[in-house]
């Protein structure tokens, strides 16, 4: 938001100092004719009345308690105390072949989560988002996309790809006993995935359909489009999108190359699991 942390945490205290007249003065000064109005007209909402069926009243004895409920209510429960992360001591830092590693031990269970973080979001290149959406539908020379999911299911693991405004994240998680096998499977997939024209066509259709629906969605218009416009003006992360024509004309080789370029770039590895 472009403000110092010390200012941010004092925001509530500063707001408590304001009175009614301060609000009135602010509104009179800034809320004039410099506003935008959005009208949305989408047909006529015709509501058909449905006859309500007769409902048989149910007699409920709210005073009656089972033995199980009594035993449950009699148990003493300790208050839950929050546990805060100590960034100095809880998170460890190291390197794997010059790749920065951030790791934290999981004391709760025998599950792990491993994430590769690349500073290559849509602000760097908007094609990256489509490329990594495409990647999740692909297989390799030896397995199909469906077989990929079956293998992960047998390992008790999950694999996901996410591209935000700032970062690309490649993530795997699952049972610690299958950690090595899951990592090897991920590395093999990222080195040997192959294009699928049918999957690409379906992805294009899905993206264009979501765009069309978003134009009619009040939540998207207000909390995404308008908020971004208020923060950044005409050029914002929300408007940093590929045209429909570009999407229709993009080729598999373009997306495959984007994934490989990102995967070969500088990144950070983050691990959370039971291993030291």
Task: Please annotate each region the language model reported.
Residues 41-44, 98-100, 106-108, 117-121, ...:
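Solvent-exposed coil/turn segments that connect beta secondary-structure elements
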Residues 94, 114-116, 172:
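Preference for bulky hydrophobic residues occupying beta-strand positions
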